[in-house]
Amino acid sequence: NCYRPVADLVEMFLELSDELGMKFFFGTYDSWCHWHSDHPEKELELNLQVVEEAWLRYGHHKSFAGWYLSQEISRGRKSVATLYRELGRCCKEVSGGLPVLISPLIDGVKENRKQSVSLEDHQREWDEMFSLIRDGVDTVAFQDGHCEFHELSDYLAVNRQLAEKYGIECWSNCESFDRDMPIRFLPIKWEKMRFKLRAAEAAGVRKVITFEFSHFMS
């Protein structure tokens, strides 16, 4: 069963974005189950309906500036590359070419692992991923909280170099919560956030977004 919510939050945020001169990227649907099974067809089918309805309902807003593909991965997965490419193409076709953003993560030690993925493996896998998705994705903003602090600048530099190779814009997603604490999750200490911003700057990244302002920084 489906129930109509009391308030249309997407409409509310778009109206506020219109008023304040901000850019709004619409996040697509994430089923979690379909695309994790390495069969993205159902995920794509559901999202095509979401994208078409979203553009029909909200595309008239001047602040509607692009799309965010919500499926987040850390390693090279060709099935997800197919989803990114095909769904991104659909978003562009429906909206007259508005840009498409993804925000993958680095398969680091803080992703419940004993050690981070090697820089060489990360580079090799994402080189292939970018070659497969470049027709459907305009911008990549890697999450910056999963690896050790001293590793971050090297990963970000590789990300930027690979993105530029395939004509994809590279941002950084500076996480505003702390993965080093026993409680999941406390707002990050400013010194740590500044360190990550400096690492992005050193890697040649010129634009940064954050997850999540409304939760951890408000």
Residue ranges and their predicted role:
Residues 1-218:
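Glycan-processing catalytic domains of CAZymes
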